[in-house]
Curated annotation (Swiss-Prot):
Active site: 144
Cited Pfam families: Methyltransf_4
Gene name for this UniProt entry: trmB
Family matches, as Gene3D superfamilies: Vaccinia Virus protein VP39 (3.40.50.150)
Keyword terms, alphabetized: Methyltransferase, S-adenosyl-L-methionine, Transferase, tRNA processing
GO cellular component: tRNA methyltransferase complex
UniProt-recorded name of the protein: tRNA (guanine-N(7)-)-methyltransferase
Native species: Alcanivorax borkumensis (strain ATCC 700651 / DSM 11573 / NCIMB 13689 / SK2)
C-alpha cells in the first residue's frame, strides 16, 4: 500500500524539504492480466502528473463530488466504493504497479466511468495536481503502521501531511482514516486533535464507527474474529 513522504518547509526559503520516505517501493511481479491492463487501459483511466493541475470536468465529463484515496492496495475496495456511489467521482493514488493494474482490470470488468488513478508519489500529486478546496473526502485506509518506535517518523499521518490534506478538502470535506494498530490509532488521534481547521465528527478525541461507505475487508473480518480491533477516524474541515 502506498504511503506518504513526510515533508516540512525550509523556514528561510519556504521550499518543501523532502526528508523521510514513508513507503518502500517493492515492485512485485505483474500478472499477465495486470500487465495487459497497464498497456491497454492506462491511456483511458490513468492520470499523469505531467498533465498538471487536474480539471475534473474534463476528466470525468461532469462536476460531481470527488473522493481521493491514498494507497488503495489492489484496488478492490476502491472499485467497490465507486460502483456503489455512481454520483461521486473517485481518484486513487498508488505507487505499486501491480495494484494499479489490478484496479484497471476492476474498472473495465465493472464498467466504471467514475474512477481514475495516478501511479505516482502521493505528495507530489497532491501538491502539483489536486486543486485546493476541491475534494469532498480524502481516504487513508490501513497505512503502514511502522510499529517500531524508531520508525514512527515514517508514518504518513504527521502534522505537515494533515495540513496539506486540509488545503485540498473543500469546506465540510471529510478526512477518513482507518487502522488496525491501536498505537497508530492513538497517534492519528493525537495529530488530529492538534490540527487546526478540523472537527471530530465523533466528538473530542473519540473514534467513529465504520461508516457505511467503507467496505469491510476479508483481512478485517479475520482480525475481528481473532479479537483484533479496527479504529476509524472521521474529521470534517471547518468552513
Amino acid at each position: 500500500m502506498l504511503d506518504f513522504i513526510n515533508h516540512d518547509k525550509d523556514p528561510e526559503t519556504g521550499k518543501v524539504m523532502r526528508k523521510v520516505r514513508s513507503f518502500v517501493l517493492r515492485e512485485g511481479r505483474l500478472t499477465a492480466g495486470q500487465r495487459n491492463a497497464l498497456d491497454t487501459l492506462w491511456p483511458r483511466f490513468g492520470l499523469e502528473r505531467d498533465q498538471g493541475m487536474l480539471n475534473p470536468e474534463s476528466v470525468f465529463g461532469r462536476d460531481a463530488p470527488r473522493v481521493l484515496e491514498i494507497g488503495y492496495g489492489m484496488g478492490q475496495s476502491l472499485a467497490q466504493m465507486a460502483a456503489a456511489d455512481p454520483d461521486k467521482d473517485f481518484i486513487g493514488i498508488e505507487v505499486h504497479r501491480p495494484g494499479v493494474g489490478a484496479l484497471l482490470m476492476e474498472i473495465e470488468q465493472q464498467g466504471l466511468s467514475n474512477l481514475r488513478s495516478y501511479c505516482d508519489d502521493a505528495v507530489e500529486i497532491l501538491e502539483l495536481c489536486i486543486p485546493d478546496n476541491s475534494l469532498a473526502r480524502v481516504q487513508l485506509y490501513f497505512p503502514d503502521p511502522w510499529h517500531k518506535k524508531k520508525h514512527h517518523k515514517r508514518r504518513i499521518v504527521q502534522p505537515a501531511w494533515v495540513a496539506l490534506v486540509q488545503r485540498k478538502l473543500q469546506p465540510g470535506g471529510i478526512l477518513h482514516m482507518a487502522t488496525d494498530w491501536e498505537n497508530y490509532a492513538e497517534h492519528m488521534m493525537e495529530v488530529m486533535d492538534a490540527a487546526a481547521g478540523f472537527s471530530n465528527l465523533a466528538g473530542p478525541s473519540a473514534f467513529s464507527p465504520r461508516p457505511s461507505w467503507r467496505p469491510e475487508t476479508k483481512f478485517e473480518r479475520r482480525g475481528e474474529k481473532l479479537g483484533h480491533g479496527v479504529w476509524d477516524l472521521l474529521f470534517e474541515k471547518r468552513a
